[in-house]
Amino acid sequence: KFDADSMNECDWMQIDEFKRKVLALQQDGVKFISLTEAYDKIANDKFRNHKYVVFTFDDGNASLKEILPWLEEQKIPTTLFINGKYLDGKSYRKNPKEKYLTYEELFAMTSPLVEIGSHGWEHIRATEQSEKEFEESVKMNIAVLEKHPRYIPYHAYTYGCHNERYDEILNIQNLVPVLIEGNKN
C-alpha cells in the first residue's frame, strides 16, 4: 500500500522509496516477471542463473492507482489479488480512511502487464472460516473477477493462512494457491 492512512504502519511505503528500491533492483540485474511466468519457471525448473522478482499487491487498495502507471512505464508486470466485496466503493475493512479500487477502476486496468487474482470475497483468514464459508467466499470472488480480461486463476491466501483441506477446495475450483512467507509481502 502506498497510503499513510493504511491499517498499520508496517504495511505501507512511500512511493518515492518504492521507486528507489525497484530501480536499485534493476541496477542489480534483477528481471521482473509476472506471477504466471514465475509459476511456469518453477513448474519447469527454469530458474537457473537469473535473479527474478514478482510484484504482487493484495486487497486492491486504491493507492495502487498511484504506482501502477509507473510500473507500466518501467515495463514491470504486476499481480493484484483482489477482495471483491470492497469493489463497491463503500465497503471498508477496519479503517474507514482506507480506500479500495472500485469495480470500474479495476475493470479499466487492462494492461498486459497487470494480472488479476483472487484474495477471497472479504479479507478474512481461510482458517477463521468454515470450509463452506471459505468455499463460498472464493466462489463469490471468482464470479466477479473472472469477468476481468486479465483474470488469472490464482488465489492468494489472506495472511498465508491455509491447510490441506482449503488447498483441496481451491483445486476443485481450478485455482492455484499462492502463499506468502512469514506474514511478509
Question: Where do the protein language model's features map onto the residues?
Answer:
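Metal-dependent polysaccharide deacetylase catalytic core of the NodB/CE4 family, i.e.
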Residues: 1-10, 50-53, 61-63, 72-164, ...
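N-terminal pre-catalytic segment of deacetylase/amide-hydrolase enzymes
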Residues: 1-53
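Alpha-helical scaffold elements within enzyme catalytic domains, especially in hydrolases
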Residues: 17, 24, 70-73, 108, ...
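Extended catalytic core of nucleotide-activated donor transferases of GT-like folds
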Residues: 34-36, 62-68
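Catalytic-core region of carbohydrate-active enzymes that cleave or remodel glycosidic bonds
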Residues: 172-182
